[in-house]
UniProtKB/Swiss-Prot annotation:
Protein's UniProt name: Protein FwdA
Highest taxon, organism lineage: Archaea
Entries under PANTHER family matching the protein: COLLAPSIN RESPONSE MEDIATOR PROTEIN (PTHR11647:SF1), HYDRANTOINASE/DIHYDROPYRIMIDINASE FAMILY MEMBER (PTHR11647)
Disulfide-bonded cysteines: none
Family: Belongs to the metallo-dependent hydrolases superfamily. FwdA/FmdA family.
InterPro entries found in the cross-reference section: Amidohydro_3, Formylmethanofuran_DH_asu, Metal-dep_hydrolase_composite, Metal_Hydrolase, Metallo-dep_Hydrolases_sf, Metallo-hydrolase_FwdA/FmdA
Source organism per UniProt: Methanocaldococcus jannaschii (strain ATCC 43067 / DSM 2661 / JAL-1 / JCM 10045 / NBRC 100440) (Methanococcus jannaschii)
Coiled-coil annotated residue ranges, if any: none
NCBIfam families with a match to the protein in the record: FMH_DH_FwdA, one_C_dehyd_A
Membrane-spanning intervals of the chain: none
Molecular function as annotated in GO: hydrolase activity, acting on carbon-nitrogen (but not peptide) bonds
Amino acid sequence: MEYIIKNGIVYDPLNGINGEKMDICVKDGKIVESVSDNAKVIDASGCVVMPGGIDSHSHVAGAKVNVGRIFRPEDSKREIYAKKGLRTGTGFSVPSTYKTGYQYSEMGYTTVIEAAMPPLIARHTHEEFMETPQIDKAAMPLFGNNWMVLEYLKEGDIKACAAFVAWLLKAVKGFAIKIVNPGGTEAWGWGKNVHSLDDPVPYFDITPREIVRGLAEVNELLGLPHSIHVHPNNLGHPGNWETTLETMKCVEGVEAKPRVGERETSYYNTHCQFHSYGGTSWKDFESKAIEIAEYVNKSKHVVIDVGQVTLDETTTMTADGPMEYDLHMTNGLKWANCDVELETGSGVVPFIYSPKGPVYAVQWAIGLELFLNTNTDKVLLTTDHPNAGPFTRYPRVIAWLMSKKYRDEWLYNKVHKWAQQRSHVADADKEYDLYEIAKITRANQAKVLGLSETKGHLGVGAEADIAIYAIDPEEKDGKKIEKAFRYAKYVLKGGEVVVKDGNVVKEVFGDTIYVDVQVGEDLMNEVLKDVGEKFRRYYSVNLENYPVSDEYANSWRVIKIDATDIN
């Protein structure tokens, strides 16, 4: 199928295109120089054209997501999705799989990264990926509390750890190294936690600092497309900004060396809003977002996503088990907890971010401060879906960023006065333009994930994942901005029109992306002996039953990396 998108106002930061009126040609799922006279015309006059959106951190599939669905029937009743010719769906903060795919597609998103996959339960994640239409997917396995990783890093054996990581990524069809509360979730298995970068992990004699730096070195030795993806210790605690800065600093000097992609950073700090808290308790709680932003701006190795609080009732879920228990003790709502053998653990707790709550108002302001004070090449839009709010609120966040008037309407009329008193968001006059919105929703993601060869831009050879929005580039009405980005005029996925006038008109199933790194054969064989012994002694499954087989995807996209020099 051939298309020509005519007269659109194009925003494509990876190619330096900032609001130019131009035509985009599509053929056989790719963007091309030209098409035949038989090409179908999409009239984008007066509309904005961007690459398909990319969500670099979201919880959309797998065990804890399904727990969130099961134990929150009240959430499933909040929003029912019934469209002629499509699958129905339910759920507001934890939507069902089909609804997840449809709603991302409505907003112009075409690629989503599942942010935390327990390796032992990876098959569950991939099963749900197969039932999530409209988007390409990838999942990040959890490594920061894995017994094998802790032991190799304690011994200082970076090469063996790298071989283990390479084996696990291929075995569970994973994309990147995810680290959550390094050492703390393992400690939670004993009813404990770690509270600083230098607290030893019980029974392993290794510290979070050594885990984070060690895995950063492993990542760059392997040359993975994405950097380490880090949820630091002490999430959600007053005063944690110091831990956040120390964690960022602990990988200084670890140079980005991707063998695939154009990534320049070696450290990705996710949901940074939850890690930018000042004060010593909730009584003197305050923002330290500007201090975090200042460090990020001057540090080549760091990039952040925000995790913007949207002031909704939502469902929190994370592999930071002790944090979820603390949350449960704070709000008294129901709590689910799970330990995943030698690998990780997690928790799920409902949460209500009331705009009239003083702490929640400051959390809201902290996220906006990060957006408004961080270099737009180094910040990415997320809500840590569903933890700070559902992904369907991205359009509202975009409206807050583009319109100071809309932002101030919330600041002065809807949220608690602490947002004014304990942050600097009221002082921020900055308003994002559409070029910057394109950066923080697609271009930056493509680059830091190592996918920018074919994703996140509209150059010739790129995948024809395209979003068209009915919005004037000069628009400052927050509600109009929000509506335009919530329901795209057109969306193309793989060169096919899948959304028209905000409605899904065609169901497609994207690829599941994973990394296959080949290291030296002798080194891998030695590591597999260790792996086999661990499975025999400790795991509840046999090693032969552990890997995810090829049947668990609609279609795989494999990023192959030759790292056989590691031996």
